A protein has these predicted regions:
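Active-site neighborhoods and metal-handling regions in enzymes and metal-associated proteins
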Residues: 1-249
Length: 249
């Protein structure tokens, strides 16, 4: 396994890809209101990414039919943005990415439609997953090892009532959306490859509210919880530094 150190020019292109992605995220978040369909959110992201001269990297990836993955309530990952409309209190996770001049970005956010007052249980869930993400980002610093990232994420989830979906991982990113290394959301300190400044990673805890067992929806894409409880995904892409992950998006 080889984890590349990026050059300044490569990092400039990755930051640009991330800037475009952040613009798409911000536009979608403004439309995360009751009555808006997942398909409409997909169109917003697609328009912004393409109008900026970038390419949506999810579209066509292993045959995926959309620009975003949209996960609603018991969806966990790989959700097709279909005609379902957002309702007050829903938990939504959106994963998206862009390619700028051959270099990738990839990030995910979660939110409760209507905010925490609309559903305090779901607000607590997704903010805990975000806390785990940020703990992993903090551990992604030069001199640490890959296992330190997983340990940091797992420590947050272990101290919560939630469960890691361990079959899904973070990853390296660069010329391809998914590169070495696999970044597990669990692990032991002081294990795995040594982290160096300039490595570019996606840190991506994927968590179930209840039992972590999942299944594939009949549409062949959406991964959903078996017990019908919620799933949640948060993800940042960025660069390893001496003080943790420099978050691009």
């Amino acid at each position: 396994m080889r984890i590349e150190i990026r050059t300044p020019d490569q990092l400039k292109k990755m930051r640009k890809a991330a800037d475009i992605l952040r613009a798409a995220q911000a536009a979608m978040q403004k439309r995360c209101i009751p009555g808006v369909s997942l398909k409409e959110l997909d169109g917003i992201a697609d328009d912004i990414i393409r109008s900026a001269g970038a390419i949506p990297n999810f579209y066509g990836f292993h045959g995926f039919p959309a620009t975003i993955c949209a996960m609603l309530n018991d969806d966990v990952v790989h959700g097709i943005p279909d005609a379902r409309k957002l309702q007050e209190g829903d938990l939504l996770s959106v994963d998206c990415g862009a390619i700028w001049q051959g270099w990738h970005s990839d990030a995910a956010f979660s939110l409760v439609i209507g905010g925490g007052k609309a559903n305090a249980r779901r607000e607590k869930f997704h903010t805990t997953v975000k806390e785990a993400l940020l703990a992993g980002c903090d551990a992604a610093r030069e001199g640490n090892q890959l296992g330190d990232i997983g340990y940091a994420i797992e420590s947050v989830i272990k101290n919560s009532p939630y469960s890691l979906c361990k079959e899904y991982t973070g990853h390296g990113i660069g010329r391809e959306m998914h590169e070495d290394p696999h970044i597990f959301n669990y692990g032991n300190k002081n294990t795995g490859a040594r982290l160096k400044s300039g490595m570019t990673l996606c840190i991506e805890p994927i968590v179930a509210e209840g039992n972590p067992a999942v299944k594939i929806h009949t549409n062949g894409w959406n991964v959903v919880t078996v017990d019908g409880k919620d799933g949640c995904q948060w993800e940042h892409c960025g660069m390893v530094t001496s003080t943790g992950l420099e978050i691009f998006a």
